[in-house]
């Protein structure tokens, strides 16, 4: 690598670090890290690590009954707190900063295997622009940044067909946040062909069973707080807010442009990009049924799923060749 390439790379990493600091310090301090939210965050942290619902239940605090099985980040923070004496809220803030920084770096590296540095940087710039939305409308969901890092690595490994690396990342991801249980579906849809579908089906089924076992095991071990949700009420609530706020609806602001560009780029996308679009749609449907969909923080994985096809759509608008017209890079070039 030339000296100029090192300089450009270093400056890009530095810029991503600055973005992370700005987001966490100047956006986060006025929202989820504010003094107003401090008591709620501390109470919910204690509830998770001790597996005891807070007073009034999870829903009364803007959480849900499955929060206590998203164990990796709260347990890590509790361990670091006991070992170092650093305040819990400061540790959460530090983890968010590191994870946002890592997410931007990994996102750029992933895209740069298929797209130019400028195109990859543009996608990262767009992601940075919508990051403030991920701080809004909630007080305590400390696993979403780390979950995004795990999703990025899993998507990268899935595209590169590195099954064992994908499996390792997926195992960690489901401990961070159980929505990663669907990742084997992307591995299969993105890679299976008429000649290889049996291989990828067996691999996806194997890791899927392991992830499901972990999920059910956590649910069984940490049971006692489950409350049956009315999913129809949740769907109606989400659509009512979606229609009522229109263009100002946070997911519309965050994902409207990538979705349009991904549709435009669908024809010139390769198999994995097309599978990622359908997979993103499936995730969106699940989230509309199960969560407060206006909270962009829980939908961040849609960006790396849509971005490659969206960049193909941008190329189409600019009259440049898409992914199917360019010489693809070898699938074994994954560098982590």
Residue ranges and their predicted role:
Residues 126, 133-152, 176, 298-299, ...:
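Multi-pass, polyprenyl lipid-linked donor-dependent membrane glycosyltransferases
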Residues 1, 182-209:
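Perimembrane helix-loop-helix junctions
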Residues 59-86, 179:
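Short hydrophobic/aromatic helix or loop-helix immediately within or flanking a transmembrane segment
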Residues 91-115:
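Transmembrane-helix motifs of polytopic, lipid-linked glycan transferases
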Residues 106, 146-165, 306-309:
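Specific aromatic-rich, kink-prone transmembrane helix
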Residues 152-157, 164-177, 183-189:
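Membrane-interface alpha helices of multi-pass inner-membrane proteins
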Residues 251-273, 283, 309:
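Hydrophobic, aromatic-rich transmembrane alpha-helices
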Residues 108-130, 149:
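Transmembrane-helix signature of polytopic, membrane-embedded enzymes
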């Amino acid at each position: 690598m030339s000296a100029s390439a090192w300089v450009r790379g270093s400056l890009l990493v530095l810029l991503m670090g600055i973005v992370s600091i700005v987001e966490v310090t100047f956006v986060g301090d006025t929202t989820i890290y504010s003094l107003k939210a401090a008591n709620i965050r501390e109470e919910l942290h204690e509830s998770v690590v001790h597996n005891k619902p807070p007073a009034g239940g999870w829903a009364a605090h803007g959480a849900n009954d499955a929060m206590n099985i998203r164990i990796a980040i709260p347990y890590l923070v509790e361990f670091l707190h006991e070992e170092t004496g650093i305040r819990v809220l400061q540790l959460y803030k530090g983890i968010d900063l590191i994870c946002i920084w890592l997410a931007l770096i990994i996102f750029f590296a992933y895209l740069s295997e298929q797209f130019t540095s400028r195109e990859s940087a543009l996608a990262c710039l767009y992601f940075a622009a919508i990051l403030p939305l991920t701080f809004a409308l909630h007080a305590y969901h400390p696993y979403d940044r780390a979950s995004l890092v795990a999703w990025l690595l899993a998507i990268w490994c899935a595209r590169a067909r590195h099954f064992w690396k994908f499996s390792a990342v997926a195992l960690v991801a489901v401990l961070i946040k159980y929505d990663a249980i669907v990742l084997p579906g992307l591995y299969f849809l993105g890679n299976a062909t008429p000649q290889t579908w049996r291989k990828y089906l067996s691999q996806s089924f194997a890791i899927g069973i392991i992830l499901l076992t972990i999920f059910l095991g956590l649910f069984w071990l940490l049971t006692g707080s489950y409350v049956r949700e009315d999913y129809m009420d949740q769907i109606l609530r989400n659509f009512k807010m979606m229609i009522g706020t229109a263009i100002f609806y946070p997911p519309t602001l965050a994902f409207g442009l990538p979705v349009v560009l991904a549709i435009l780029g669908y024809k010139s996308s390769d198999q994995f990009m097309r599978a990622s679009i359908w997979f993103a749609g499936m995730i969106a449907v699940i989230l509309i049924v199960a969560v407060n969909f206006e909270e962009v923080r829980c939908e961040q994985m849609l960006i790396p799923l849509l971005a490659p096809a969206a960049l193909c759509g941008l190329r189409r608008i600019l009259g440049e060749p898409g992914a199917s017209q360019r010489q693809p890079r070898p699938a074994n070039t994954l560098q982590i």
